[in-house]
Amino acid sequence: MTVIRLTRMGRNKKPFYRIVVTDSRKRRDSGWIESIGYFNPVVEPKVLKIDEERYNYWLSVGAKPSEKVKKLASK
């Protein structure tokens, strides 16, 4: 099954997340199909960028967003 989830980037105590489309059986940070955005919770204000067109495309073909991605995308 295809999922949309966060993958952690950055360094110790300075996380930065990519919003990626991947297979649900893969590990969190392993290979992904497509990167559709990013989320940076460290800076003020928090930065979120999602390619809405690609996000909606992946939802239309059956990808399931994680709870956190769902929450972020609704903002």
From Swiss-Prot:
Extract the InterPro entries matched here.
Ribosomal_bS16, Ribosomal_bS16_CS, Ribosomal_bS16_dom_sf
Q: Name one Pfam family in it.
A: Ribosomal_S16
GO MF assignments: structural constituent of ribosome
PROSITE patterns given in the database record:
RIBOSOMAL_S16
GO CC, sorted alphabetically, is: cytoplasm; small ribosomal subunit
Q: Which domain of life is it from?
A: Bacteria
* Keywords on record: Ribonucleoprotein, Ribosomal protein
Biological process according to GO: translation
Q: Does the keyword Zinc-finger apply?
A: no
Family the entry assigns: Belongs to the bacterial ribosomal protein bS16 family.
The record's listing under PANTHER family reads:
30S RIBOSOMAL PROTEIN S16, SMALL RIBOSOMAL SUBUNIT PROTEIN BS16M
- Protein name (record): Small ribosomal subunit protein bS16
This chain's source organism reads Aliarcobacter butzleri (strain RM4018) (Arcobacter butzleri)
